[in-house]
């Protein structure tokens, strides 16, 4: 079964408004297709979408983070996976992780002669916004 065929079911479920079904299907597929980066990445994206929609951690953030990391581990050359993980880390207010991953993403773009993109522009703005709302008195230097 090709990757496109494997992911067709969850994509159709999402199109039909069944995000929960798509996530459940991808969760099962992660166990069956442990070495398929696209399955792990799509699960992380859909699960994050679910949490954003619910404005709550319906799906544990740690599980989402592990799915992103697994996708990156399986396909180290995929810049999209790095950018998506960095964005997720920033959404979770894990600023040091986000900064590290955005730096790695920028380096990959540079090595591939790809100009700096909108992802990095938005990241810099969102990092500044996140720092502005943090209680910096809690940070010990």
What are these regions (language model features)?
Residues 29, 70-71, 105:
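Canonical positions in the second alpha-helix
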Residues 4-28, 32, 48-53:
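Alpha-helical segment of the N-proximal tetratricopeptide repeat
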Residues 17-24, 52-67, 92-104, 134-136:
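Structural signature of tandem alpha-helical TPR/SEL1-like repeats
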Residues 39, 81, 115-116:
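TPR alpha-solenoid repeat register
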Residues 139-141:
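Conserved small/polar residues in nucleotide/adenosyl-binding loops
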């Amino acid at each position: 079964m090709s990757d496109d065929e494997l992911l067709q079911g969850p994509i159709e479920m999402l199109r039909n408004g069944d995000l929960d079904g798509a996530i459940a299907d991808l969760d099962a597929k992660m166990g069956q297709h442990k070495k398929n980066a696209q399955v792990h990445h799509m699960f992380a994206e859909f699960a994050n979408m679910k949490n954003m929609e619910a404005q709550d951690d319906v799906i544990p953030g740690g599980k989402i983070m592990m799915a992103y990391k697994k996708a990156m581990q399986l396909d180290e050359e995929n810049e999209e996976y790095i950018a998506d993980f960095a964005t997720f880390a920033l959404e979770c207010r894990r600023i040091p992780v986000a900064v590290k991953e955005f730096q790695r993403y920028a380096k990959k773009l540079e090595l591939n002669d790809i100009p700096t993109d909108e992802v990095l522009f938005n990241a810099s703005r969102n990092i500044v916004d996140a720092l502005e709302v943090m209680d910096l008195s809690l940070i010990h230097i």
